[in-house]
Curated annotation (Swiss-Prot):
<feature type="propeptide">
    <location>
        <begin position="21"/>
        <end position="193"/>
    </location>
</feature>
<feature type="binding site">
    <location>
        <position position="340"/>
    </location>
    <ligand>
        <name>Zn(2+)</name>
    </ligand>
</feature>
<dbReference type="GO" id="GO:0046872">
    <property type="term" value="F:metal ion binding"/>
</dbReference>
<keyword id="KW-0732">Signal</keyword>
<dbReference type="InterPro" id="IPR036436">
    <property type="entry name" value="Disintegrin_dom_sf"/>
</dbReference>
<feature type="short sequence motif" description="Cell attachment site">
    <location>
        <begin position="455"/>
        <end position="457"/>
    </location>
</feature>
<dbReference type="Pfam" id="PF01421">
    <property type="entry name" value="Reprolysin"/>
</dbReference>
<dbReference type="Pfam" id="PF01562">
    <property type="entry name" value="Pep_M12B_propep"/>
</dbReference>
<feature type="active site">
    <location>
        <position position="337"/>
    </location>
</feature>
<feature type="disulfide bond">
    <location>
        <begin position="311"/>
        <end position="391"/>
    </location>
</feature>
<feature type="binding site">
    <location>
        <position position="346"/>
    </location>
    <ligand>
        <name>Zn(2+)</name>
    </ligand>
</feature>
<keyword id="KW-1217">Cell adhesion impairing toxin</keyword>
<feature type="binding site">
    <location>
        <position position="336"/>
    </location>
    <ligand>
        <name>Zn(2+)</name>
    </ligand>
</feature>
<dbReference type="GO" id="GO:0005886">
    <property type="term" value="C:plasma membrane"/>
</dbReference>
<keyword id="KW-1199">Hemostasis impairing toxin</keyword>
<keyword id="KW-0378">Hydrolase</keyword>
<dbReference type="InterPro" id="IPR034027">
    <property type="entry name" value="Reprolysin_adamalysin"/>
</dbReference>
Length: 494
């Protein structure tokens, strides 16, 4: 079994005293300055990895408010799909699509040692940038732009002042609300076992950046792509509680000009985007959902998405305004709009996630959480039960969604799949399958079980009792109009 190289970073902490300063993420009232010092070492019994720019596992040690913190991170190997691609356009409008190597990337997930409720989403591309939770509080870390310095700022999520304090809203409804329920810290919010149990679903995502995003990033396509990667890395953490696994299939950048009319009218723009996706994007890229990100200021909104439309070729879409210099805020907004696609409506004041506002809050406020409420969980469960969108049933890729095996350290493993041993990276004994429409609780469903309901004059598809995928009914015609998009095959454990 391959061992990973552990890297410990000792951070000297110097609290900043004085008035607020402007960081890249906005005006911050108070932050601590930390200076990373990289120390490498191997745990007992570990073998040195082949040379990589970014280690599979890293640790950072520092202090927050005088409290020592050990941050354990593991590379997010489920971030990119197997055939991940990037698309941009030449000045004459010609499409250019490439498949860049992404195995040795710089995006991590993790936790804080001795805090079971903690989580983290960090990029190490250019310094440390991202968020982590500690004792129910959310902290952000980002590099300070100081010449010849490796200093970073660490500050609380709510300490970041936004330039525009006016409420920002989602366009699905125009209902403002403020929670009048007692606020509980996230560490005190315990979901029931029923709430915590969701069958896994797999969303292959495409992010499309319009030309305003290119202009906003000074025509730097690399910087724009990195921004999108950070957003998706955050979204994956947010959807983990629903057992939804998001993989990024493609980033499309309209570098030579918009391919639709992008205006301040979110409904009009989204309608055009959905039509473009149905006639263009679905024929080029295998995916389940597409999100448009724009720097155009939408009319009194920051996002808009269709409700309960996952897998629909035209309506499995949403639009998000790039409204913040903090990627966590933008990620929460995009997660919100995708939540609509997955059947979740806006939260009411009876909904609870342990914060003043949850992901599906109708408005975004300074204290908005990146967690789904109990109401959202119930609405998602109802949507999956009644609609069961077929395109997200099957795992797109097995090898990239299981972490490199790690032992003799405290790093978290990918343990969300009960059919798979995350420590040995081997199938559990006596199990038939890992996932798929004909796989349930690690066993093949019985022959004759319906795995795809008929629509109109079509015929049902049935499990054969031998595979985890849903075999096409041989008595169907040559073309089944409902077979879009073609689902990926499930993973069978041999």
């Amino acid at each position: 079994m391959i061992q990973v190289l552990l890297v410990t970073i000792c951070l000297a902490v110097f609290p900043f005293q004085g008035s607020s300063k402007t960081l890249k993420s906005g005006n911050v009232n108070d932050y601590e300055v930390v200076n990373p010092q990289k120390i490498t070492g191997l745990p007992v019994g570990a073998f040195k990895q082949p040379e990589k720019k970014y280690e599979d596992a890293v640790q950072y040690e520092f202090e927050v408010n005088g409290e020592p913190v050990v941050l354990h991170l593991e590379k997010n190997k489920g971030l990119f799909s197997e055939d991940y691609s990037e698309t941009h356009y030449s000045p004459d409008g010609s499409e250019i699509t490439t498949n860049p190597p992404v195995e040795d990337h710089c995006y991590y997930h993790g936790r804080v040692q001795n805090d079971a409720d903690s989580t983290a989403s960090i990029s190490t591309c250019n310094g440390l940038k991202g968020f982590f939770t500690l004792r129910g509080e959310t902290y952000l870390i980002e590099p300070l732009k100081v010449p010849d310095s490796e200093s970073h700022a660490v500050y609380k999520y709510e300490d970041a002042k936004k330039k525009d304090e006016a409420p920002k809203m989602c366009g699905v409804t125009l209902t403002n609300w403020e929670s009048d329920e007692p606020i509980k810290k996230a560490s005190h919010l315990v979901a029931t076992s029923e709430q915590q149990h969701f069958h896994p679903r797999y969303v292959q995502l495409v992010i499309v950046a319009d030309h305003s995003m290119v202009t906003k990033n000074n025509n730097d396509l690399t910087a724009l792509t990195t921004w999108i990667h950070q957003i998706v890395n955050d979204m994956i953490v947010m959807y983990r509680i629903l057992n939804i696994h998001i993989t990024l299939a493609n980033v499309e950048i309209w570098s030579s000009g918009d391919l639709i009319a992008v205006t301040s009218s979110a409904p009009t723009t989204l309608r055009s985007f959905g039509e473009w996706r149905a006639r263009n994007l679905v024929n080029r890229i295998t995916h389940d959902n597409a999100q448009l990100i724009t720097a155009v200021h939408l009319d009194n909104l920051i996002g808009y998405g269709y409700l309960g439309t996952m897998c629909d070729p035209q309506s499995s879409v949403a639009i998000t305004e790039d409204h913040s210099t903090d990627h966590l805020w933008v990620a929460a907004t995009m997660a919100h709009e995708m939540g609509h696609n997955l059947g979740m409506n806006h939260d009411g004041n009876q909904c609870n996630c342990g914060a003043a506002g949850c992901i599906m809050s109708a408005i975004i406020s300074q204290y908005r959480s990146y967690q789904f409420s109990d109401c959202s969980m119930n609405e998602y469960r109802n949507y999956i039960t009644t609609h069961n969108p077929p395109c997200i049933l099957n795992q797109a890729l097995r090898t990239d969604t299981v972490s490199t095996p790690v032992s003799e350290n405290e790093l978290l493993q990918n343990s969300v799949n009960p059919c798979y041993d995350p420590v040995t990276c081997q199938p559990k004994e006596k199990e038939d399958c890992e996932s798929g429409p004909c796989c349930d609780n690690c066993k093949f469903l019985k022959e004759g079980t319906i795995c795809k309901m008929a629509r109109g004059d079509n015929m049902h598809d049935y499990c054969n009792g031998k595979t985890c995928d849903c075999p096409r009914n041989p008595y169907k015609g040559e073309h089944d109009p409902m077979e879009w998009p073609a689902p990926a095959k499930g993973s069978v454990l041999m």
